[in-house]
Every structure is written in structure tokens, then in C-alpha cells.
Amino acid sequence: MMGFIGSGLGIAVFLLVFIIFKWINILNEYERGVIFRLGRVLKDAKGPGLVIVMWPIDRMVKISLRTVVHDIPPQDVITRDNVSVKVNAVVYFRVMNPVKSVVEVENYVYATSQLAQTTLRAVLGEADLDDLLSKRESVNVRLQTIIDEHSDPWG
């Protein structure tokens, strides 16, 4: 009888220690944790530092706040004067609102990449080749403005 109680107590202690370790999360300076409690998102992201996640009631998604550098694959674009050009681009972005980046879009990196590709084709298709070559800075500003405007709801 004592062996059964002792082993039951051992299992209970093991489970308690397991649950406590599951609750404790450490987030780096550049990370934030978006916590879902029973499926509903808490309004503010947590971190950096020690974050308590009450498993199995809570679920945490880690989001990096560092700048992401994403290479856009080469795009075939036809300019307004019917010249076919192949362009590639690099997009720099970072998450400003971790909660929105998790809740408002399924995959913010993929969505930003697709938005950048679509915007690149649209903006370059509205310009002449001569304008693309001579006014690169204004084209870049226009691309940045459009991408910022459309990706802002994603955080």
C-alpha cells in the first residue's frame, strides 16, 4: 500500500514540475509573445523576459520584432511603353504590432512578399522604361507607400 501511495505521489510531483516548467517561458529582447486564452487573444503582447503561460489554458505564439529581409524573385514586367523587363527586389519590413500580425493575417511574411510582388508589377507596369531608369527613387517611394498602406492592418 505504501509503495502505491509513494509512486502516486511521485507521479503527482513529476506532473506538477512538468506543468510549472511548461508555464514558464523566456522571451528575448527582440521577441514578443501573443497569448491566446481559451482561443481568444489577450489584447497586449507579452515580453521580453519571463512570461507565464498557463498551459493548457493558454497558447503563445512568438513573434520577432527584428527587421526581416525578404528577397522578391525576379518578375517579368511589361512597362507602359510595351518593353519587357525582368526586375527583382528586396523588401525590408518588421512587425510593429505583434497581436495584429498573428490575428489579422495567416502568414505575414508570405503576405508581405505577395503584396510586394503584386505592387512591383503594378507600379512598374504604369511607367515607361525611361522613367524607371531615370526616376528610381520616386518609383521606390511609391512602392514603399503602397506596401505600407496595404500591410499596415497586419501590424
Show which residues each predicted segment covers.
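N-terminal hydrophobic membrane-entry segments
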Residues: 1-155
